[in-house]
From Swiss-Prot:
Residues bound to FAD: 148-157, 181-183, 306-307, 364-368, 393-395
Tissue specificity annotation: Expressed in the epidermis and intestine.
Pathway it works in: Lipid metabolism; mitochondrial fatty acid beta-oxidation
PANTHER family hit by this protein: ACYL-COA DEHYDROGENASE, ISOVALERYL-COA DEHYDROGENASE, MITOCHONDRIAL-RELATED
Cofactor list: FAD
Catalytic class of the enzyme: oxidoreductase
Gene Ontology biological process terms, A to Z: fatty acid beta-oxidation; medium-chain fatty acid catabolic process
Quaternary structure annotation from Swiss-Prot or TrEMBL: Homotetramer.
Induction / repression: By serotonin.
Organism ancestry: Eukaryota, Metazoa, Ecdysozoa, Nematoda, Chromadorea
Protein name per Swiss-Prot or TrEMBL: Probable medium-chain specific acyl-CoA dehydrogenase 10, mitochondrial
Function: This enzyme is specific for acyl chain lengths of 4 to 16.
Keyword DNA-binding in record: no
Amino acid sequence: MLSRIATSSLGLSRSATGVIATQSRQISFDLSETQKEIQDAALKFSKDVLVPNAAKFDESGEFPWEIVRQAHSLGLMNPQIPEKYGGPGMTTLETALIVEALSYGCTGIQLGIMGPSLAIAPVYISGNEEQKKKYLGALAAEPIIASYCVTEPGAGSDVNGVKTKCEKKGDEYIINGSKAWITGGGHAKWFFVLARSDPNPKTPAGKAFTAFIVDGDTPGITRGKKEKNMGQRCSDTRVITFEDVRVPAENVLGAPGAGFKVAMEAFDMTRPGVAAGALGLSWRCLDESAKYALERKAFGTVIANHQAVQFMLADMAVNLELARLITYKSANDVDNKVRSSYNASIAKCFAADTANQAATNAVQIFGGNGFNSEYPVEKLMRDAKIYQIYEGTSQIQRIVISRMLLGHFAQNGTSRI
């Protein structure tokens, strides 16, 4: 009946409806065999290596170098670097699968392994061939770290508030300023740096900043002390100070003055990966909670038989599955060259909120034990919070989503994007 309606009412020929039917059959929510193999390999590594070591590195705060090296040798570090630069050449979706699996074991160790992704993105998007060969090639060849330097003590969500400045002198730029909360900052071999190149405060952000690749051994760079954070404690986070740091003009990413665009475009590429990290944590929360609920007894039966616990588990499962769908969709958008800040922001926002609620429920299901460091969910709750903060707070994501939604509705008369 529907085919007759489509043919007559919409004026479609039978050949056209046949094409539509064929295209609809191509929609699949199943991973390919290759993707399943990648996911299985990453999850095995996560359960065999990350899970047994998570508490140790959380307590010591040491950077997990040995695990990082193992991950690199298995092709699980920086998997999105193209083959032409020596990398595995995996898709954004495949990279998200790896992040999700590693985060199941420990989001802090995962960040140690995959932290360079945010620095990689602007080079991949805006770098010239020489820059890609040199800097992406180095990351593919060795288990080294690169860092994204944009956030400052007075400029987090407000990127336009960046005070680090650069001044062109001959064939060089001189950079001065400080960056804060820089992931991997203590070990980075190179930095992506955003600096104000136009001192006029009235200049639009799109023309006021220039982006650079800065080698980590350049004179004038000072790495501050490692920060003691609430969660993801083995991830190295520091203040990085640039004092009269001379950078050759050939290290400008994109065009001079176009740094803001370079920095922002990176987020559409990396936010699916951040969302995937939150997915892995939510997944672990659900597994730990289900296992505990089937073992712990109260009122003469396992607590899994109590409706209050069942409802918490059900809510965790519902949100996890929905977060997984939008995260995979946003990753697929990147792979299909569809720039969608809308889907990327929804994925990052919803997955982050889901992780925090999952961790809260997990601690509640564990009761007093959940508040104790002898059990894994206490760490999961501490690790979850940062997902609502870094790479764009959940509030910033909601601003992005609402602006795009309203703009689309004004043009098209529908909220469906």
